[in-house]
C-alpha cells in the first residue's frame, strides 16, 4: 500500500527523472522503472545496495542507476529530479534534497523522530522555487541514517 501511495503522490510522468532514497530490496525502484521513469536510487547499507543493484539488473531493470551512499545528500550529479521519494524517516526535510528537486517537482518523505510515529509529508516546489509542505498521514519508517 505505502509504495503505491508514495509513487502516486509523486504524480510521475513517463520519462520523469526520480530519486529514491533508501533502495532496500529494490522493490520501489523496480516499480518506478516499470512505469517508464528514469530512476536513481541510493542505499546507505552497502550489502543492501549491492544486492538490490544485482537484483534489479537480473530482473531486467538495469537502467535504474544504483549507488551506495548517504541519501541525505541525494545524488547531485543526477539532479535536478522531477520527483524524490524517501523511504526512511528524517528529523527534517534534508536541504540537499530540496536543492536537487526541480521547480515544479514533488518529494514524498516521512518526517519525525526515529522509532516513533512520523508524518508522511508531501513537499511541492513551485516554479519560482517556493516550497509548500502538506502532512498527509501518520506512518512509521526506519530512521534515515548517515552523517548529517
Name each model-derived stretch.
Residues 36, 147-148:
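A short, highly charged, low-complexity intrinsically disordered segment
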